[in-house]
């Protein structure tokens, strides 16, 4: 028996391995099974070039549980005593830091032939045994034993067949790995597509009302997964079946892309476009990354462009660099090339479907839209390609490319400054009246109700030349597209003041909501009262919800305009009645107000151009008193108008009708509206 120390100068390398090199203890099984598969594949390679002339026989890798042990057995190339010394014992580095650095620079040489991958066994084991026999003729079987210290023993043993058994004596704090269900789940996670059969126990069947083991191995993996096959060999049903195996709880995918490239990097895989739910983040991390059919991670940021992390599927590449635990990706030029390649393949596939089967593309647009919009917002190259097949959808459900839509609206939706105005709604039901008003003017209205449409609107205004997006409820219909300079309002100032004060006094008090009353001549057939919301302020608040650094806008109140149509019969009647009821009380106040205004204006004119110290104190005091008096008289007038409005049910009824149309009338206010409606009828 040979005894010795593993060739490291640090007292004990294993705590370093546990702490720094592996993020998840569970990957020990992946590493050891992968090593067994590598050893088996090497034997196959040697046999194919006639360097091994014996019988290959059954090459299944077996994983088995004992009372306190896990054993991984293969019938691969095995190891000689010299090879154990080379690959296991002689990790001859000057210290732990150099050890880590050396590994980082030489990962591929070590992983896959025992080496560091093997040492992951000590994360869960108090003792590890290697019982191995080389395929070489006349080779002597040996047994290597180590308890996690730098000391080991190596002795000759009897072993009938070539290959390697690794026996792990599981630590007391890792007993979970002795449970059949735990090992079964890990094998399913990491080893489902390894290229050599992996058996865990025996298949079971129901007999006499209970499950019993059969003599047949329970092989847990598909050795020739779909992505390793040629697309020409596969049917649509094959792709759908594989998707169901990967994601049994998901709806059928929209379509898929089969990747297969050998130069300048190796990459195979299948990416599926899923039906996306409403929450973007819930659907990330669904692409599984493999390295030569060994599962690595489902965190593919950096390999897959960010907008495509919403996709499902598998990618397999030996050219993606991994750290020691194979759980995180390193920055690398190959990765950037792969990311660019995937983005191009996706845009080419979308372009192909659009070109060859536009009806199918339009049918699936609502599901595709989030991927395409996300890509256009985050990747300039993708935007350049996607603008040819990205679609607008109008409120009638018709689809247009960007170019088609520009042609459609150019004649009727260009304003006086030659800007093309894109009208849109984000809720067909709530904005129905506004949509209908726009359509009655001959305008087309887009439906932009997607999760990313707020950001898309802002981006498209920058990308599309002389183009502006305006929501249909941001102004009265005549002001949405201003084609010529407007005439001034027909109502004189005193009448506007009376109407405005009356309606303003009856507006409801709502948390974080402010109203501004406006009066416009909108024609006898226009609505008597409407509520609009400034496009700019609303958009800033919407962007604040999705973009960091704009929380200031999110804290501001919602600003709405209550627009009175001075041409409408009901508004005219309210104004006439108000003048009749209030004129006697208003007249003396108005006379005094005019006198105050006249004197105040005269004083201000007199003080124009003078420095503050040159203005007599008496004049300053008088002007201050006049300002206070003016405010007081104005409040008296507003109070009289408010008193009138409070008794006039039509004023509140018109306001509530506008609120109702805008989905802003609820609870007690809605109940009061219903009662008042009955009384008025």
Swiss-Prot record:
Disulfide bridge positions per record: none
UniProt GO cellular component terms: cytoplasm
Region (Disordered) residue spans: 601-620
Region named B: 327-545
Pfam name, any one: HSP90
Region: C, residue numbers: 546-681
Keyword Nucleus part of the UniProt annotation: no
InterPro entries according to UniProt: HATPase_C_sf (IPR036890), Heat_shock_protein_90_CS (IPR019805), HSP90_C (IPR037196), Hsp90_fam (IPR001404), Hsp90_N (IPR020575), Ribosomal_Su5_D2-typ_SF (IPR020568)
Keywords of the record: ATP-binding, Chaperone, Cytoplasm, Nucleotide-binding, Stress response
SUPFAM superfamilies per record: ATPase domain of HSP90 chaperone/DNA topoisomerase II/histidine kinase, Ribosomal protein S5 domain 2-like
Region entry A, spans: 1-326
GO MF, one example: unfolded protein binding
Subunit and partners: Homodimer.
HAMAP family, sorted: HSP90
Function of the protein: Molecular chaperone. Has ATPase activity.
NCBIfam families found in the cross-reference section: PRK05218.1
UniProt protein name: Chaperone protein htpG
């Amino acid at each position: 028996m040979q005894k010795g120390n593993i060739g490291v100068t640090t007292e004990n390398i294993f705590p370093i391995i546990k702490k720094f090199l592996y993020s998840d203890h569970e990957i020990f099984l992946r590493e050891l099974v992968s090593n067994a598969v590598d050893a088996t594949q090497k034997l196959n390679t040697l046999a194919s070039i006639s360097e091994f002339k014996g019988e290959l026989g059954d090459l299944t890798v077996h994983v088995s549980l004992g009372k306190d042990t896990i054993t991984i057995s293969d019938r691969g190339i095995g190891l000689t005593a010299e090879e154990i010394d080379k690959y296991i014992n002689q990790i001859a580095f000057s210290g732990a830091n150099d050890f880590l650095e050396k590994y980082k620079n030489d990962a591929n040489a070590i992983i896959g032939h025992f080496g560091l991958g093997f040492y992951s066994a000590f994360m869960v084991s108090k003792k590890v045994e290697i019982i191995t026999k080389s395929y070489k003729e006349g080779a002597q079987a040996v047994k290597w034993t180590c308890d996690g210290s730098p000391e080991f023993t190596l002795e000759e043993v009897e072993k009938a067949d070539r290959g390697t058994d690794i026996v792990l004596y599981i630590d007391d704090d890792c007993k979970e790995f002795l449970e059949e269900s735990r090992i079964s789940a890990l094998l399913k996670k990491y080893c489902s597509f390894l290229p050599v059969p992996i058996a865990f126990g025996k298949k079971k069947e129901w007999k006499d009302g209970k499950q019993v083991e059969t003599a047949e191995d329970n092989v847990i993996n598909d050795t020739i997964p779909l992505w390793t096959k040629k697309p020409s060999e596969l049917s649509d049903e094959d792709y759908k079946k594989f998707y169901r195996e990967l994601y049994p709880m998901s709806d059928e995918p929209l379509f898929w892309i089969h990747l297969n490239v050998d130069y300048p990097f190796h990459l195979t895989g299948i990416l599926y476009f899923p039906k996306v739910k409403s929450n973007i983040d819930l659907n990330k991390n669904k692409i599984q990354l493999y390295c030569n059919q060994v599962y690595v991670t489902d965190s593919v940021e950096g390999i897959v462009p960010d907008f495509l992390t919403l996709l499902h599927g598998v990618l397999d590449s030996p050219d993606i660099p991994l750290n020691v635990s194979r759980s995180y990706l390193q920055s690398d030029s190959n990765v950037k090339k792969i990311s660019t390649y995937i983005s191009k393949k996706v845009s080419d596939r979308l372009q192909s479907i659009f070109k060859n089967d536009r009806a199918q593309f339009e049918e699936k647009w609502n599901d595709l839209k989030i991927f395409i919009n996300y890509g256009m917002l985050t990747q300039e190259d993708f935007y350049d390609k996607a603008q040819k097949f990205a679609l607008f959808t109008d409120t009638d459900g018709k689809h247009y490319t960007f170019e088609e839509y520009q042609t459609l609206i150019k004649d009727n939706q260009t304003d006086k400054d030659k800007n093309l105005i894109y009208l849109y709604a984000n809720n067909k039901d709530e904005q129905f009246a506004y949509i209908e008003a726009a359509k009655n003017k001959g305008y087309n209205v887009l439906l932009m109700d997607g999760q990313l449409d707020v950001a898309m609107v802002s981006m498209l205004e920058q990308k599309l030349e002389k183009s502006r997006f305006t929501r249909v409820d941001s102004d009265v219909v005549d002001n949405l597209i201003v084609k010529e300079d407007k005439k001034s309002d027909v109502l004189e100032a005193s009448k506007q003041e009376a109407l405005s004060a009356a309606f303003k006094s009856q507006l409801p008090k709502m948390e974080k909501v402010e109203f501004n009353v406006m009066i416009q001549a909108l024609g006898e057939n226009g609505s008597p009262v409407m509520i609009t919301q400034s496009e700019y302020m609303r958009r800033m608040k919407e962007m604040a919800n999705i973009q960091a650094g704009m929380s200031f806008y999110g804290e501001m109140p919602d600003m709405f305009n209550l627009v009175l149509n001075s041409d409408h019969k009901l508004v005219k009647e309210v104004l006439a009645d108000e003048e009749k009821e209030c004129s006697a009380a208003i007249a003396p106040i108005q006379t005094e107000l005019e006198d105050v205004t006249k004197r105040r204006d005269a004083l201000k004119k007199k003080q124009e151009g003078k420095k503050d110290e040159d203005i007599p104190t008496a004049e300053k005091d008088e002007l201050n008193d006049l300002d206070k008096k003016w405010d007081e008289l104005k409040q008296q007038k507003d109070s009289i108008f408010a008193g009138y409005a409070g008794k006039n049910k039509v004023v509140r009824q018109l306001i509530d009708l506008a609120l109702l149309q805008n989905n802003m009338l609820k609870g007690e206010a809605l109940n009061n509206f219903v009662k008042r409606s009955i009384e008025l009828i």
